C-alpha cells in the first residue's frame, strides 16, 4: 500500500480507464490468488513438502497450455523444451520416493491450476490497467478478505495464537505476499505468462539452497543436478528468443 500511494496513486488519477472492468478483473484475480493460497496451505496438512513441490511445479506445464488453447496467447517454441527440463529438474530436486497420489496431493494439483490462472490473469489485467503496484495491492486485499471467511468458519483464530507466530505471519504477509507478488506484477509487464511460470520454478532451487545454508539440510548430488537442470531451463527460455530476434529479426 505505501508503494502504491507513493508511486502510482497520482498517476492513476490522470489515467482514463473503465473502473468497473478493472474492478471486475481485479476481483477475479484476488479470488483466484486467495483460493490458490488456501489450497496450498491446507494441502500441507495431508501431504509432505516433497510431494507438494512436485505437483505444484505442474503449473509450469499448465500455464502455456491454458495460455495457448484458452486465451490464444502465442507461445515461443523455446518454452516447451524449457517446460520439460523444469519438470525433470523439479522431480530430481524433490527426491520423491512415494508417488502415490493422496488427498493432499489432489489439493496441490487443483491449486496448481489456480496458480496458473493467477499468472495469466495478471497478464490480462495489465493489458487494460498498466499499474502493477495497484494490481498487487488490491489482489492482496481481496485475497485477505476471501481467505478470512473460511478461516473464521473452520478455524479457531485468537490473538494469543496470532501473537505466537507473529514473526512468521509478518514475513509471509509483507515479504512473501506483498513485496514478492508486487515484483511479479511489475515483471509481467514485459514477460509472457509461460516465461513467468518457468522462472517461478526457481522457487524450489532457492528453497533447497537456503535450506542447505540456513538449516544445514543435506544437498545431495541428485538435488544439485536438479538445480542445474532448472537453471538451464530458465536460461534457455530467456536467451533463445533474444537470439532469434537479434539474428532473424523475430521473437
Name every feature range the model reports, one short phrase each.
Residues 52-58, 122-144, 177-213:
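Helix-helix packing/entry segments at the starts of transmembrane helices
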Residues 41-59, 103-114, 163-175, 228-230:
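Structural signature of hydrophobic alpha-helical transmembrane segments
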Residues 30, 34, 38, 60-65, ...:
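Hydrophobic/small/kink-forming positions within alpha-helical transmembrane segments
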Residues 1-28, 41, 46, 68-81, ...:
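Membrane-interface interhelical linkers
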Residues 2-8, 59-81, 205-225:
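C-terminal transmembrane-helix exit sites in multi-pass transporters
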Residues 24, 28-31, 58, 80-85, ...:
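Hydrophobic residues within alpha-helical transmembrane segments
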Residues 5, 165-167, 175, 201-251:
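C-terminal-most transmembrane helix of multi-pass membrane proteins
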Residues 75-95, 112-115, 147, 222-241:
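Hydrophobic transmembrane alpha-helices of multi-pass small-molecule transport proteins
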Amino acid at each position: 500500500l505505501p508503494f502504491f500511494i507513493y508511486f502510482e496513486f497520482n498517476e492513476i488519477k490522470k489515467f482514463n480507464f473503465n473502473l468497473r472492468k478493472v474492478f471486475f478483473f481485479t476481483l477475479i484475480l484476488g479470488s483466484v490468488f486467495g483460493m490458490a493460497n488456501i489450497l496450498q496451505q491446507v494441502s500441507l496438512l495431508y501431504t509432505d513438502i516433497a510431494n507438494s513441490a512436485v505437483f505444484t511445479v505442474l503449473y509450469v506445464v499448465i500455464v502455456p497450455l491454458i495460455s495457448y488453447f484458452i486465451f490464444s496467447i502465442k507461445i515461443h517454441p523455446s518454452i516447451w523444451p524449457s517446460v520439460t527440463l523444469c519438470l525433470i529438474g523439479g522431480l530430481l530436486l524433490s527426491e520423491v520416493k512415494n508417488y502415490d497420489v493422496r488427498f493432499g496431493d489432489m489439493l496441490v494439483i487443483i491449486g496448481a491450476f489456480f496458480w496458473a490462472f493467477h499468472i495469466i490473469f495478471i497478464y490480462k489485467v495489465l493489458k487494460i490497467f498498466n499499474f502493477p503496484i495497484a494490481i498487487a495491492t488490491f489482489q492482496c486485499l481481496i485475497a485477505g478478505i476471501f481467505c478470512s471467511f473460511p478461516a473464521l468458519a473452520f478455524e479457531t483464530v485468537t490473538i494469543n495464537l496470532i501473537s505466537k507466530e507473529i514473526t512468521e505471519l509478518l514475513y509471509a504477509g509483507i515479504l512473501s505476499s506483498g513485496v514478492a507478488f508486487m515484483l511479479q506484477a511489475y515483471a509481467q509487464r514485459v514477460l509472457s505468462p509461460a516465461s513467468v511460470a518457468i522462472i517461478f520454478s526457481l522457487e524450489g532451487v532457492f528453497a533447497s539452497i537456503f535450506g542447505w545454508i540456513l538449516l544445514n539440510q543435506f544437498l545431495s548430488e541428485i538435488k544439485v543436478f536438479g538445480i542445474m537442470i532448472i537453471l538451464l531451463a530458465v536460461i534457455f527460455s530467456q536467451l533463445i528468443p533474444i537470439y532469434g530476434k537479434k539474428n532473424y529479426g523475430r521473437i
